[in-house]
Amino acid sequence: MQVIVALAALGSLAAPALGFSIPRGVPVSQSMIDVKLSSTGNSMVKATITNNGNRALNLLKFHTIMDSNPTRKVSIESEDGKEIQFTGMMPTYKEKDLKPSYFISLPPKGTVEHSFDIARTHDLSRGGKFTLKAEGMVPIAEENGTEITGAAKYHSNELHMTIDGEKAASVENAFGIVKRGPLTRINKRTSIDMQSCGNSQELQALTAALKASAQLSSMSAQAVSQNQDKYMEYFKDPQYMQTVQSRFQAVAQESSSTTGGGTTYHCSDTMGGCEEGVLAYTLPSQNEVFNCPIYYSDLPPLSNECHAQDQATTTLHELTHNPAVQEPFCEDNGYGYERATALSAEKAVQNADSYALFANGKLNLITLMLIIDPD
């Protein structure tokens, strides 16, 4: 019976959304906000965000140019066209119960500035000439509200900077080298930092999430070729089918490897990245994943709701951010169903949430519950 249900689920992936998703049907503006980049020092950048509309807006900061965490806010290319390695964090944020502090209020025609040092999240020690630009989509709430009612795309100007490599190297990186305790492969899975797992309940929850991530990823790898309509909904172009399938297979292997994986998973935050609203985060430059307290307190192990977050798919999402799982690793190009399915094929195939959303079909979750706990 379990096998029959599992096969049926492969052809019936739903269309859920993770994270602070933009509700279906809300308007997406191409010109509601303007973002201008300017240089204010050797590696300091100022983003000036302008509300072009005639009404006040509440702009959600998460995964945007305004994010206060050391996330990727701009793309940086050297003079020879090579992308500069990102050394910051890739967080997964909680969708529900958004707080006013997560937003920036912007009056009509008003502006707000956000400054950041790109040397904290990129290796610029070689110095020289660099080209920066920013693009993305900002979830929007009405004035004084926290319910997402729309979104605004932004594309900044290109900023050309000449950076002193020695000065850039003297800037403290947002995250140093991760110090690990003893490593253990729990039930032959990815390496877990046991020193970070002082709470036995957290260790048990992480172990279960890895098992569920492995099974969801394995089923999704099969679904890529068995449900092409659903594949096209998320990834747009059949030429990337093998890439998507191989990434799901890589995540499944990393979650349940019999030979040991390339990532290290931490039950708790040992690097100070768990700011308010962060469920978990990855340091892709080091192949390290960290769970935050609300990963355990606010998420169920598995949800039977299509649009809900849970521990299993959050773990799956984080693993796609690691180059040790598959290169190039996934970015956060679009978060939530509306943003993920609006991406181009080239962006979608490299978007972490596209994989988590595809895997997080309601029937897949119900099937997995039956497989894990048939009683």
Curated annotation (Swiss-Prot):
It is found in: Secreted. Zn(2+) binds at H317, H321, D332. It comes from Arthroderma benhamiae (strain ATCC MYA-4681 / CBS 112371) (Trichophyton mentagrophytes). GO terms for cellular component: extracellular region. PANTHER family: NEUTRAL PROTEASE 2-RELATED, PTHR37016. One of its GO terms (biological process) is proteolysis. This is Probable neutral protease 2 homolog ARB_05817. PROSITE patterns: ZINC_PROTEASE (PS00142). It catalyses: Preferential cleavage of bonds with hydrophobic residues in P1'. Also 3-Asn-|-Gln-4 and 8-Gly-|-Ser-9 bonds in insulin B chain. Probable secreted metalloprotease that shows high activities on basic nuclear substrates such as histone and protamine. May be involved in virulence. Residues 20-189 form a propeptide.
